[in-house]
């Protein structure tokens, strides 16, 4: 079950969005009436995502979205606005907002936007994990190549023989070749 924070200065809108999301299996872990409260709730609850109005008192939704994104206080943010404004949309894109929903909102517009945002977020997170694994494998390969080169120089071995030597030594020591190379 996904954990959600709803931030809107209008209590009736928060209640309506809560009802829609809860009826679709989401858990509302917090509500906020301004951007600053949204940040505070996110720090406490660490939601999967936030649905936040743009125009709120104290701190706007866009300002709060920037803090939430930069401080990794939630998986992602979706913006809710009464305005079809290119400038707001451009700012939302710059802050990696995952969804832009124009009021009035109803279940038929909210739920597809939420599902698409969740799907895009999952794909983005998987790409980050894959990138991290690839970077780690590349780093491991660099260590192995460096160790292999040192063995080739010190023992006057071919590349293939140096690799076999590393493999044999790692098996004797009971550690991975990467650990040995480091």
Which residues make up each language-model segment?
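Two-component/phosphorelay signaling modules centered on CheY-like receiver
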Residues: 11-30
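Active-site residues of response regulator receiver
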Residues: 53, 81
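Alpha4 helix (beta4-alpha4-beta5 surface) of REC/receiver domains from two-component response regulators
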Residues: 63, 84-99
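C-terminal output helix
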Residues: 87, 105-114
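Receiver (REC) domain active-site loop signature in two-component systems and cognate sites
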Residues: 56
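C-terminal output/effector regions of signal-responsive regulators
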Residues: 122, 129-182
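Acidic catalytic/metal-coordinating carboxylates
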Residues: 34-37, 60-63
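Active-site beta3 strand of CheY-like receiver
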Residues: 45-51
């Amino acid at each position: 079950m996904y954990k959600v924070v709803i931030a809107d200065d209008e209590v009736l809108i928060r209640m309506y969005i809560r009802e829609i999301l809860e009826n679709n299996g989401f858990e509302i872990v917090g509500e906020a009436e301004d951007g600053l409260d949204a940040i505070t709730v996110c720090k406490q609850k660490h939601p999967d995502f936030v649905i936040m109005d743009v125009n709120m008192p104290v701190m706007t939704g866009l300002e709060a979205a920037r803090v939430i994104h930069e401080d990794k206080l939630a998986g992602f943010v979706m913006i809710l606005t009464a305005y079809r404004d290119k400038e707001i949309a451009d700012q939302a894109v710059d802050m990696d907002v995952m969804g832009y929903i124009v009021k009035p909102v109803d279940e038929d517009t909210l739920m597809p936007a939420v599902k698409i945002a969740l799907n895009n977020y999952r794909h983005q997170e998987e790409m980050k994990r894959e990138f991290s694994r690839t970077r780690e494998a590349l780093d491991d390969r660099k260590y192995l190549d460096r160790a292999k080169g040192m063995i080739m120089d010190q023992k006057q071995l071919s590349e293939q023989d140096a690799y076999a030597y590393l493999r044999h030594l790692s098996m004797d020591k009971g550690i991975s070749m990467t650990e040995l190379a480091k």
